[in-house]
């Protein structure tokens, strides 16, 4: 089993548990260059809010898109967009990534901005 398959296996297990809870989930994905966050409806078929370092405004604001500062900016932005849509409680889906570095920074900034998980 390679690194990606292991991560997907971990993500599947967590997503199955979140689906049982019928919770809106905050999904985080990271690549070597960018960080992405989406708030997905409990049925899994609708993206309620999204933010990523690919967006021009974020890239201009943070400069380097692959560090913790960029993840903090994404966390604040996704929380603001979710709260605008009336979502305050979410389940955090780390997509099999270790809760460390950019993933943890995004989660902490989203909590500080008003999301509860």
Curated annotation (Swiss-Prot):
Keyword Nucleotide-binding attached: no
Pfam families: Ribosomal_L18p (PF00861)
The entry's keywords: Ribonucleoprotein, Ribosomal protein, RNA-binding, rRNA-binding
Keyword Ribonucleoprotein: yes
Source domain of life: Bacteria
Cysteines paired by S-S bonds: none
Family membership noted in the UniProt record: Belongs to the universal ribosomal protein uL18 family.
Biological role: This is one of the proteins that bind and probably mediate the attachment of the 5S RNA into the large ribosomal subunit, where it forms part of the central protuberance.
Assembly mode: Part of the 50S ribosomal subunit; part of the 5S rRNA/L5/L18/L25 subcomplex. Contacts the 5S and 23S rRNAs.
NCBIfam families: L18_bact
Listed name of the protein: Large ribosomal subunit protein uL18
Species per Swiss-Prot/TrEMBL record: Aliivibrio salmonicida (strain LFI1238)
């Amino acid at each position: 089993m390679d690194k990606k398959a292991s991560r997907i296996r971990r993500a599947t297990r967590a997503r199955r548990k979140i689906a049982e809870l019928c919770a809106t989930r905050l999904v985080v994905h990271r690549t070597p260059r960018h960080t992405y966050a989406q708030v997905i409806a409990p049925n899994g078929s609708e993206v309620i809010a999204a933010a990523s370092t690919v967006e021009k405004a974020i890239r201009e604001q943070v400069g380097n898109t692959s560090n913790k500062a960029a993840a903090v900016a994404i966390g604040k932005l996704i929380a603001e967009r979710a709260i605008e849509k009336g979502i305050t409680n979410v389940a955090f889906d780390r997509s099999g990534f270790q809760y460390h570095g950019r993933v943890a920074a995004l989660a902490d900034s989203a909590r500080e901005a008003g999301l509860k998980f």
